[in-house]
């Protein structure tokens, strides 16, 4: 179903609107790197746009903070259907290091439906391009997804015998 959504939404190129919902800007720097001539994302038809009304894709970095929540919902509604959401970076994927703080709601998927996750802190430009290329069907995914669960302290540091 998602592949047909991508084909319908992205017949020729991918118009992306990027927003930061409360991150440290590490992911933003990597997203900007993807657009430089060194990585040349435009060769894949990826173009950054200045308005969500022109976008096919919403690229979100950072954890969702309480202050940004109403604006993020309005932003999501402004993107025309069919819309695709990418969560970029550990904070957008699950809240990151700020997950349990007083002003953070968590990852983007706590608020909006997320179609694709690109983890990393920050994710390298190659990882961002790879994630988008997999989403577009330009390349096949070489790894199988694993169920994510937070490790307990006992799992991270087993007691010595």
Q: Model features per residue range: what roles?
A:
Residues 1-53, 77-83, 104-105, 109-118, ...:
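Iron-sulfur (Fe-S) cluster-binding modules
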Residues 57-58, 66-68:
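A contiguous binding-surface segment within folded domains or other stable secondary-structure elements
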Residues 85-87:
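Structural beta-sheet core signal
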Residues 67-80:
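Amphipathic helical hotspot of TIR/SEFIR-family domains
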Residues 22, 63-65, 91-93, 123:
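Short glycine-rich anion-binding loops that position phosphate/pyrophosphate groups of nucleotides
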Residues 69-71, 96-98, 128-129:
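Short glycine-/acidic-enriched loop or helix-start segments at secondary-structure transitions
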Residues 93-109:
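Glycine-rich, charge-decorated loop segments at or immediately adjacent to ligand/cofactor-binding or catalytic sites
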């Amino acid at each position: 179903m998602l592949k047909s959504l991508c084909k319908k939404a992205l017949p020729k190129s991918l118009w992306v609107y990027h927003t930061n919902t409360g991150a440290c800007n590490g992911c933003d720097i990597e997203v900007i790197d993807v657009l430089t001539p060194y990585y040349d994302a435009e060769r894949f038809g990826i173009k950054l746009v200045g308005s969500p009304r022109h976008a096919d894709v919403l690229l979100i970095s950072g954890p969702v903070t309480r202050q940004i929540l109403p604006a993020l919902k309005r932003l999501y509604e402004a993107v025309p259907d069919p819309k695709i959401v990418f969560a970029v970076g550990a904070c957008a994927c699950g809240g990151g290091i700020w997950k349990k703080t007083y002003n953070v709601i968590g990852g983007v998927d706590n608020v909006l439906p997320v179609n694709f996750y690109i983890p990393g802190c920050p994710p390298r430009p190659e990882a961002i391009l790879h994630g988008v290329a997999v989403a577009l069907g330009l390349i096949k995914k070489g790894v199988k997804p694993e169920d994510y669960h937070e490790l307990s302290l006992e799992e991270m540091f087993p007691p010595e015998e």
